[in-house]
Amino acid sequence: MNAKINVLQVIPKLGYGGAETGCYDLAHYLAEQDCGSYIVTSSGELLKFVKKNKVKVFRLPVHSKNPFIIIFNIFFLSILIILNKINIVHARSRAPAWSCYLACLITRRIFVTTFHGTYNFKSNIKKFYNSIMLRSKLTIGGSNFIFNHINEKYGEYLNKNKKLRVIFRGINIDYYNQKNISILKQEKIKKEWNLSNDKFTILMPGRLTHWKGQQKFIESLNILIEDYNKINFQAILLGSDQGRKVYTKKLLSLVERYSLTKK
């Protein structure tokens, strides 16, 4: 009989972003497959939804880029890894990845990373900081675009002993099955968001950040009205600005400029 595999995922905050929901979904999937499933994070909105009888959560300041806190995290991650007999450590962000990498060296565990975005690097120091995501035994790219980006920008950190694979992001379609959402809850949301049953609804989910394309989305809505005379719709931008107040104000200003406040 094969020994049970214990997997530890480490992420700065367990919020509503793509990396975070991926971590959440995988944690519960692992538990369903009779694997030991563990998460280390500092905080996050999704924590209250974690099924504690299936997934064990530890709170550590893994969101911090402070070198002293990173060293602190190395020590405590090493203890967690040993005490819980962790086999695989999966880091989903750069700051905690440094702690995970060194903790895995100490405990001789398998280190895995997921490269979630095109991290900025304006200097060699920043590029070195980003390179931690490629110091694992396996680096996962979430798309062909990210895969090509890694090969193009970080080729010097790749070698035959390090695996780079594309694993596309999936979703749990049960979340979006209308049958799983009560009529009462549906009506409550419609009332809170002032949604009409008689209008075509367009939803754009995602963090409010310029490269997600919310500005283009708003401009496209204006084109629907001005060029195609399509007016019977309502649109929703759903996501956190994560402190990007200037960008949020820019979007609101754009909505007003195109007279879309009632849309």
Language-model features: where?
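A short helix/loop element that forms part of the nucleotide-sugar donor recognition site in Leloir-type
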Residues: 177-195, 250-253
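A conserved mid-protein helix/loop that constitutes part of the nucleotide-sugar donor-binding site
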Residues: 20-25, 200-226, 249
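Glycosyltransferase donor-sugar binding loop
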Residues: 39-45, 171, 205, 234-249
